[in-house]
């Protein structure tokens, strides 16, 4: 009998059928990476609420499996939830120069200092645990975006 193939799980925690809260989990074997970590802004009827972040319950239950967060670009709907998530799950963050510059500013506002930022050039490939992540330059309304 042949070996049973290992499955890849793709789990969107936000950003599907909505604007904002972009966050996707890729799970393989016993490891996970997070793609983006965004927020959204409240609907008109959500009085008293300033921001909305994805539900990270699944991440908290599996935080030992998380190997890193990969950022595609520096818009709030892709990086805005980072300070809230990193207070509970501190893992390395991978992104391009401008993206990480915006992240650093956000962390200063939130008084976060014990973070590991890993700068990656567009076109580079990075090994993150079981994952091989290629940063492909992408055209977007903000410079230094990657897919």
Residue ranges with predicted function:
Residues 18-21, 28-71, 84-91, 95, ...:
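Pre-active-site segment of Zn-dependent metallo-hydrolases
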């Amino acid at each position: 009998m042949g070996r049973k193939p290992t499955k890849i799980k793709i789990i969107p925690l936000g950003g599907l059928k909505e604007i904002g809260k972009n966050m996707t989990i890729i799970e393989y074997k016993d490891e996970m990476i997070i793609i983006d970590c965004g927020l959204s802004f409240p609907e008109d009827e959500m009085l008293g609420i300033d921001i909305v972040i994805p539900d990270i319950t699944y991440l908290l239950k599996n935080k030992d499996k998380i190997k890193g967060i990969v950022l595609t670009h520096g818009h709030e709907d892709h990086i805005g939830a980072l300070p809230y998530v990193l207070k509970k799950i501190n893992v390395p963050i991978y992104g391009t120069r401008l993206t990480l510059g915006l992240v650093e500013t956000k962390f200063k506002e939130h008084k976060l200092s014990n973070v590991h930022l890993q700068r990656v050039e567009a076109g580079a490939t990075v090994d993150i645990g079981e994952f091989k992540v290629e940063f492909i330059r992408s055209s977007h309304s903000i410079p230094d975006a990657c897919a």
